[in-house]
């Protein structure tokens, strides 16, 4: 398997920034092993970009390129004092111009992460959940029936 270290990621980020945005990337890009639910993130305070190492391991360099493009959209817009958030028109426009995706592929499917399954005692609907639910407070969203935890 091909490996990519932080220096290769830095070089790739600088190259993508010049190629797609026609502006230099003057900060740091590095892998963060602690990222779990996101492909990468742009840090507003330091202007650095962190990338989820597991994305490279599972999906390869093309996924990393897409993540870098997305984070560079945040980076360049923030430095230009334009709308850098997902909801902003500037961000959506720049993502479209550069071919940066709005989201990346999930590393694990939701079904694989499910730890609890609840069933409505009234309509028998099943609800897979990652986190435990307080069955005294939560009710079925379809019929307002009482939920019961099933043993996996």
From Swiss-Prot:
Pfam family, one: Zn_ribbon_SprT
Start and end residues of each SprT-like domain: 9-149
SMART domains: SprT (SM00731)
Keyword Cytoplasm applies: yes
Protein's cellular compartments: Cytoplasm
Catalytic residue positions: 71
HAMAP family (alphabetical): SprT_like
Protein name, as recorded: Protein SprT-like
Species this chain originates from: Staphylococcus saprophyticus subsp. saprophyticus (strain ATCC 15305 / DSM 20229 / NCIMB 8711 / NCTC 7292 / S-41)
